[in-house]
Amino acid sequence: MTIRLLSWNVRGLNNPRKREVCKNLLKDWKCDIVCLQETKVSSTDIVFVWILWGSPFIDWAVLDAVQSSGGVLLIWDKRVFEQLDIVVGQFSVSVLLRGVVDDFVWAYIGVYGPNDDGQQSFLWEELLRVQARWPMAWCLVGDFNIIRYPSERLGCESFSPAMFAFSNFIESNSFVDLPLEGASFT
């Protein structure tokens, strides 16, 4: 089964025009599951999600923004995936899903990482707790607010301890870091 997945830092969805752009793109791309980061929405409800997705056949999980900062929204087509469990953390929202057609069980985790390098270790610990709870296939997406390599950020010329920690987290958990597509680097 091919999954149409989208992970997108929307940089705010409080503006009605921005929501309309998001809705149109989700409709055009016919996604099965999406992760929207940095929603900046402090109270997400079903009407808000329905308006974005444009179909009643949805389920969703959210980590609401705190004082219009952050926020992660996962939305999926419930004709494709059945929700088995949800975990909402400080920096992530995770959902355990089963494919309706193939019964494949996997975890989809959306992240909006802390902007402070000193807080990154809390994100790694949070994700490891979810991994211990659901030791199966994962798809980990989002904006980690950290880079692995200096070439990923304009003007960055050297590795920082936080970059080494991020690379170590990825490698020690056998994750695959897919390249960024469709947007410029920060």
Model-derived features: positions:
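A shared catalytic/ligand-binding motif for oxyanion handling
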Residues: 1-186
